[in-house]
Amino acid sequence: MPHQILVTVRAPLKPGRGPETAHLLEALRKTVEHDGGPLAQLPGVHFARVFVLPGDDELDITDSLVYLSEIDAPQRPHLRALAADGELGALFAQCVGYPDGGSRRAAARWVRQHQVRVATRYVHTVGRGVDQVRDEARLRAEIETFLDDPAHLPVGGSPAEVHEAIRRFVAGRPDLAWALRPAAGPGLAFRARELLHAVAWPALLLPLAPVLLPAAVLGLLAIRRRESRDVPETERPTSAHVATITRGEDHGTVNPFTAYGQVKVGLLRRTTIVVALRGLDYAARHWYSRDNLAGVRSIHFARWVLLDGGRRVIFASDYDGSQESYMDDFIDRIAWGVNLVFSNGRGYPPTRWLIKDGARYEELYKRYLRRHQLPSVWFAACGDLSARNLDDNAVLRAGLAGELTDEEARTWLALL
């Protein structure tokens, strides 16, 4: 099965193109809400979004257009299709340097040139492609339809006998027989790269520990001194801003979250956020690559992207449930991890020793996130399936690979 890639494309808007871009985004929103629009036609898409990232006069940065997607490898066909689509091309044409009237090859080259490296990525289950998600959801639906007819089941049958009846049903359906085979994992080349990454970083850092550890202690002490002077944002988000954001929420099981912020000034904070994101990326790739992020199981994908020479950052995710429960999960389970990164942003609630307090100031934290959220045009290929649904469907399929004992079959049947 393919591994997943998080695509980020960002380009500055031409001067004066803000109103036209807003008009095109609104038109795109309507088509996406109707039938997925052009985002649904892009190869391998799990989720995708387009939005305007506001400029920053203080940093002399203009507004820019940003495209984010979570896709199945390979990446090149996706980028080619992205560049070839007329509706998306009209949006990109609002950006500086886009080859107006040029060839598809020139447009694809422009898209590739404006890709931005993701600093930290999280994938709920690496190797679970969007086709697998759809197929396993269909498998569940077919099995449940089969079970709706009592005539299909052995009278007084044990759990193991019911399980075997379901296996025979699946085996007898050419369109479902694939489910009797275990799902394949990511390719060998990807697994080799990940293994090399997992081994190389500790091997590189361990010899440097005598230097890095004292430097980290000194850096933490310096941060602690500065924390007492940090000024948190206390303003509530405006009702108009909240209305704009919530307009794109709660249309299905999965919701988008897109936010940005300015990194606190100074080399210390910029270095800290880079180190923190590298550490989180390592953990997400090698410790939390299957089913949960430090105990939070409701996130499908997440990413942090450093922009503008590390002076600004984007955070984007696709999560289950309401935003309130999403924020509560982070506060209750991994507030320290949230603080580790977000405390380097201007206006964040006050922290101690980088990871303490911060998100624990619940009201300030929730206001901060809402104020920094951005509206987006967002597409979900399977927006009615929660991360837990995907996990259960995968376990359901895996249970068809062989015979089960009564106890195993009873647990398996409880998924239905």
Q: What do these predicted regions represent?
A:
Residues 88-103, 336-352:
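Conserved short beta-strand edge segments in small beta-sheet-based binding/regulatory domains
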Residues 50, 302-306:
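Short edge beta-strands and adjacent turn/loop segments
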